[in-house]
Amino acid sequence: MAATLRPPKQVLLLHALRSLVYHWVGGSGSTCCLCPLGAKRYLLTDSIVKLKEFQRKKVAVACNLPGTKETYLRNLEEKLTQNKLILKEELRTLLHLCTSRDDVELAKHVIYRYHAENRNITLGEYKFGPLFVRLCYELDLEDSAVELIKDQHLQGFFSDSTSFNILMDMLFIKGKYRSALEVLIQMKNQDLKFNKDTYVLAFAICYKLNSPESFQICTTLREEALIKGEILPRRASCFAVALALNQNQVAKAISIFSQIMNPESIICTNLNIMIHIQSNMLKTLIDILKDATEGNLSRFVKRHVFSEEVLVKVREKVKDVPALLAEFDELNKKLHRSGQVTAYTLDALLCHTPSDRQSYTVLLNKRTVSRRTFQPLSQSLWAE
């Protein structure tokens, strides 16, 4: 949808986004009351970033290059000087040869030339955006990626959500939350479709900024997604709940939490405790902990695990009620004895990226029978 056809709510959202970025007071780090350690972790799995795959291709390109890297770069510099046409394969090879900041500077000049020559050719065209962002990811040159992705002269070069997601993840790792928000603004301005990873990143960035403005942005993005009928990932909703709690919007936190499907994760367990703490539902809070310690469950049955940090907050909340305090102390001992307490903070749990599930799928789908002999694959290999 063109920018002129945006509904008023979306225009207000973009205005709020810009206002938060350009009128923010203070540092870019987290002021989250739930995360004193301010853990900086990545949010995307390697199946999305594909850094290892990119690095393997770099090695292959370097090995198969006719001549030397220096000669190849020099020839490209001459083509730029002589205003000669830059070919797609030349740019792709260049991006796989870059190993330094100087190499990336040359790549940026080649990208500008290539895009100027090919801006009107988009159908079925190779997408260089993710390739360049992965290169910046590898070399820790996030500023170069931000510079190009925001440049209006390169409008259309970064036409995919993957480029924006990887860059936001890179900025999140570095704690550059305001810059990450600028990238989110750019993505919104280009009307690129948000996927599940985008929502996780967007809500995580808002959570880290932890301000009334970022809470409003998170709320609006969430409402827009629900209006479109999109199902938000549980991780995204957890960030939204945590942000609402940090902003003391307990009713909103309860509302969001109630819509999470299958709230059985360790994060949801601890967010539920935080909701009860801030809602002053102390008796129910103790009952939840009691339920977690009772029952002769098999060691194969998943038990609820609580953050030590969250349990400290529970004790602080019930310390003025002697009966509840005594009951909590007993439950706390039981939880520790049964291994149901983790040293990870709630922030660390929120920002932890689960392992790739794709690799397990590949293993499950791995062929075990020969198509030729119909024997088990290991035996057929010996026979062949």
Swiss-Prot record:
Name used for this protein in its record: Pentatricopeptide repeat-containing protein 2, mitochondrial
Mitochondrion as UniProt keyword: yes
PPR repeats: 162-196
Protein biosynthesis keyword on record: no
Example of a GO cellular component annotation carried by this entry: mitochondrion
Family named by the database record: Belongs to the PTCD2 family.
Role noted for this protein: Involved in mitochondrial RNA maturation and mitochondrial respiratory chain function.
Chain positions with Phosphoserine modification: S378
Classification via InterPro entries: mS27/PTCD2, Pentatricopeptide_rpt, PTCD2, TPR-like_helical_dom_sf
Matching Gene3D superfamilies: Tetratricopeptide repeat domain
Compartments, as annotated in UniProt: Mitochondrion
GO biological process, one term: mRNA processing
